[in-house]
């Protein structure tokens, strides 16, 4: 019985640590180069971050099994809507092994419509970016450099997030001005 309880507790602790549910702020510094990231669109065609050069990118790493990710998705969708028609892309990169049908079912359930959805079934992006929990969202400038990172849930439909994206849009050549602070929260 004790072994069973220890196994159960260990499994729960592991699962809790795999999704970053705590609210945390982020401070950004000078933009830094991103590692090469390759991923698949929903049709299975490979692409990478170079396809989005010239655009501000909000890159959200998530998984279908991550409850905080599910909670955050609608705000990301509203962020995408707020910048529709501007050179801003909100990319939702699923880093679990779920097939495209399950990823799409998850998105349908959450009710998102404006996110550019991609898959990384081998979770290579999490290793390349040294991600330790989900969700994680990167702000990427027009030159393809990481200009900010939020670990955990953020209010992507709030003024602080809008201001960060507007600042990246206004920066000459996509940077290198630092963004300051983005408060995260649900």
Regions found by a protein language model. Give the residues of each.
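Positively charged n-region of N-terminal signal peptides that target proteins for export
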Residues: 1-4
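Bacterial N-terminal signal peptides
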Residues: 6-15
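N-terminal "domain-start" segment that seeds a small globular fold
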Residues: 19-49
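Short active-site neighborhood of thiol/selenol oxidoreductases, capturing the structured segment around
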Residues: 49-67
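Alpha/beta-hydrolase fold active-site loops
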Residues: 56-57, 88, 135, 145
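Structural microenvironment flanking redox-active thiols in thiol-disulfide oxidoreductases
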Residues: 70-110, 121-127
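Non-globular targeting/processing and membrane-anchoring segments
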Residues: 171-186
